[in-house]
Design a protein with these regions (language model features):
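Short, intrinsically disordered, charge-biased short linear motifs at domain edges
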Residues: 2-5, 36-43, 89-99
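Disulfide-rich extracellular modules and peptides
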Residues: 18, 53, 57, 111-112
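Short, solvent-exposed loop/hinge segments that bridge or flank secondary-structure elements
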Residues: 15-49, 77-87, 104
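Amphipathic/hydrophobic helical signal segments and adjacent flexible N-terminal regions
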Residues: 1-15, 21-24, 112-122
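Beta-sheet ligand-binding and adhesion/scaffold domains
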Residues: 72-122
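Extracellular/mature segments of secreted proteins
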Residues: 23-28, 55-65, 116-122
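Contiguous, well-ordered beta-strand patches that form the walls/edges
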Residues: 49-84
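Classical cleavable N-terminal Sec signal peptides
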Residues: 2-11, 30, 40-45, 71, ...
């Protein structure tokens, strides 16, 4: 279903579960040392918008390329945050670097019907 969304332009939710791990930039962060979490992404491919969990902020979708949906690709002098969905593999990654601390979230995603964006967001 996720792959079909890329081809025909759909909106859908993704319920993603995985492991969160944090530590100094440059050191290995083994999955077995991480903590479990679940996040819900709401993605509107046609409208090129997305949000997560309570949808406090609806953001523009960064790009769709080579079988990937890049939700966010932000870089500044203090760090970066890149959130990528790999539809064919039903996987996602969310990597944040804040100063000298890296936080990695990764796991699997299951598609659900699109629940829309809150009315109070653009």
């Amino acid at each position: 279903m996720i792959g079909a969304a890329l081809q025909i332009g759909l909106a859908f939710n993704l319920i993603c579960s995985g492991t969160l791990r944090s530590g100094p930039v440059g050191l290995a962060l083994p999955e077995q040392d991480g903590e479990s979490f679940t996040i819900t992404y709401r993605i509107d491919v046609d409208g090129r918008r997305w949000c997560s969990d309570a949808c406090d902020d609806v953001e523009p979708l960064d790009s769709i390329l080579e079988g990937q949906i890049v939700l966010r690709d932000q870089h500044d002098p203090d760090g970066s945050n890149v959130v990528t969905i790999f539809p064919a593999m039903r996987r996602f990654t969310d990597t944040t670097i804040d100063g000298n601390v890296a936080t990695l979230r990764s796991g699997t995603c299951d598609p659900e019907p699109f629940t829309g964006f809150p009315l109070n967001t653009a």
